[in-house]
């Protein structure tokens, strides 16, 4: 990044455990989704809150976040497209949006979706029931979230 080495590691580790937001966005195709969120501690639990949804972080990740994050701070949530999963119910979802593009690639497909949080990309099994212009809800595979400091871009948790 601007001629400065960001991380020296194996491709596996850079993909799964990026040192910062730059590395996370550089590796992987399609690229990682980035969303501004609030990290909130309430009644001893850590919650991630986006514009239209929130979820409680599991205990292991909550401890990791407590070590690195300031209490009640804004952060950047990173989630790879394969971990953004369509769901039926708005109540179960973190994002709601409208499909811009359905890109079939054989057995897999890429959904490009416009949400209140910006453009989100999801990589799914091909399914011809998805159409451009249709509403869609997504949940996140929470075991695969990344959090980055909003100012420095450094990893808070992988």
Spans of model-derived segments:
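Internal alpha/beta loop-helix hairpins
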Residues: 1-54
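Non-catalytic connector elements of ABC transporters
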Residues: 30-34, 41-158
